[in-house]
Amino acid sequence: MASAVLVAPIVLAGCGSDDGGPPLLTWYTNPDNGGQATLAAECTESSGGAYRIQTQVLPNDADSQREQLVRRLAAGDSSVDLMSLDPPFVAEFANAGYLLPVTDPADVDELTEGVLEGPLLTAYWDDELVATPFWANTQLLWYRQSVADAAGVDPTAEGFTWAEMIDAAEAEGKRIGVQGNRYEGYMVWVNALISSAGGQIIEDAELGAEATPTVASPAGDAAAEVVGGLARSSAAPSDLTTAGEEEARSLFQSDDGSFMVNWPYVYQAAREGVEGGAVDQDVFDDIAWARYPRVDADEASRPPLGGINLAIGDFTDHPDLALDAVKCITSVENNAQYMVEAGNPAARSGAYDDPEVREAFPMADLIRESINDAGPRPITPYYGDVSTSVQRTWHPASSVQAPGTPEDTDSYMSEVLAGERLL
């Protein structure tokens, strides 16, 4: 079933302020360490009594978050004033009429000023601002300095490629940490490789089911050569077919570790591991970082893009107050605070100049650059179909061939989008 075909409506009662106090805004959040609840309290305070914000935590995984929000919004639930939304779902929700667009040019300017280019691309649908980047994310290349030195490579060099990285790991008898399980993290990897090679997974994404799959291309072949080449090399991790972010991190910190592509949280996790005795200090001191590796030495990489956008529910009873709350939550100051306290990178460029951010993230400038230059996953109401098509035709990684796999993906995806194949 196409992901743009939404769950049937259910009857839900909206929430409001029935105690005579300021209007109550409900913010549906993804799970975090409490940072969003803190921002809700602080913005409530700074509103001077104009509104109150309560948070409602969604399930852990993105698919369950989407399902719960869709059920409420399909029922016209006015209690969904604000929602933390995974960027790939923005187009689907906006296309269904679930998100309240920001139309006043002054408001658009305020919400987008200083927002990095990568996340800003995910906030629009049909030329309207339908969400505001709250925090962003990207993957860096993490490497063990001792391994790079022994192999005689410099991962910070401008033209450093996946092929060079694989050769270096093989030469030193080490393994590379990637996300090879059949899940969204694998789609993130494949999309980043295709984008880095100058291609895209679909064209005319705004056409929805009429979009054209374009994986079968020189860029798709180049991406397949990286995935299949790594999988069939001695640098592949033994658990490649089931590896996610945490498996990659565990490998990287082990004696077999060499290189890894992963989100910035791994640095803080390693530091906390040292404090807790789970990671040796010499391992932490050996960790270095660089920009996401290139597919082609002559073409800059387009690193992965993640994060959360903040959207206003179209059925809210308090659209103006919800907009004011979004402005508060996504301010530069709160972006910086959330990055330090929750460990999630900021969507606004100015937050990276904050002294506390720079202390917590020595690679802050690289994170900012990477997010700005990142390649978003396809922006389409049928994103679930597109992602699942890639995951099913590219897994396991050891089966990926060029040519072959890209053509299979286009055929499979075309049938899914046309309703000729069920997922």
Set out the residue ranges of the language-model regions:
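Conserved N-terminal structural module of periplasmic/extracytoplasmic solute-binding proteins
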Residues: 2, 8-91, 108, 415-423
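A structural signal for short loop-to-beta-strand junctions that line the ligand-binding cleft
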Residues: 70-72, 79-81, 109-146, 298-302, ...
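C-terminal lobe and pocket-closing loops
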Residues: 265-283, 295-393
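Extracytoplasmic/periplasmic solute-binding protein
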Residues: 130-134, 139, 163-219
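Conserved C-terminal helix/tail region of periplasmic/extracytoplasmic solute-binding proteins
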Residues: 149, 369-423
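Short, solvent-exposed loop/beta-turn-alpha elements that line the ligand-binding surface or hinge
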Residues: 103-115, 158, 180, 199-222, ...
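Glycine-centered hinge/linker elements that transmit conformational signals in sensory
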Residues: 167-170, 208-241, 288, 292
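Hinge/lid segment of periplasmic solute-binding proteins
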Residues: 87-138, 284-290, 359
